[in-house]
Amino acid sequence: MGSMQLKVAQQLSEPGGQVNEDLIWHGGNDFMVLDGASSLTPGSHHDAVGFVRAFTESYAVCARADKPLHTCVNESLDTLRERFDPARYEQGIGPSASLAVVRCHNGWMELLLLGDCTALILSTDGRTERTYLNEVARFDAIALDMAARIHEETGLPIRETIHNPLVHEQLVANRHMMNQPAGYRILSATTKPLTSTDVMSISLDGLAGIILHSDGFDNMEDDLTRQPIDLGRSYRMLRELERTDADLNRYPRFKIGDDATALYLEVVPA
């Protein structure tokens, strides 16, 4: 068998509200999904949108095939530190983003995940391997559990209890754990540089493709990987599930509908 490579087969990125803070980017042999989170500064006006765009622009300049993937990511972040000065943000916490990035070279792919983006690796024999960092989910669960307890105590729907001041305080505390030793790794220009990243090196031999997705598609993996793959079908199913749980009580979460982004890459001959 000759050398294999990755090709964009389908891509979808839809907002959960008025503004989409997710982004898909691909250039050459590099492909990525970003899930932005705006700062908590009053009047920030979705500053994650500018952050994820700035990162991809920087990455397009910094990334080279002869550099390790984690070096390309760190150097891209370093160029943004002056633009996203911590002094501009409440408690020094600027916008951030989860990341799933794949680089393909000579029949292999490198995969790097930060935050709560997910990779679904599809084998030609029908198996799926889900690759996901549980770091952000650990902290989100603390805030969601708090909102659920207030719901049980007061009878208010979780749609309202997630705005409780105690829950907000917990969310702020979570943000302070970005890129801390006991916290979670994520793209941020206002925290310490990333000291460690886990890069997987995976042969494309025996693979059918890979799906990168933001957490807006969490718990939708069974449909995302159902053949024939149809990201539009999965998206419609997601929004219908959300519509039937407008109070957030059945599936506790921070908003009725999150931004939902997925990138499906097929393995094809080079």
Stretches found by the model and what they are:
Residues 1-270:
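PP2C/PPM-type serine/threonine phosphatase catalytic domain
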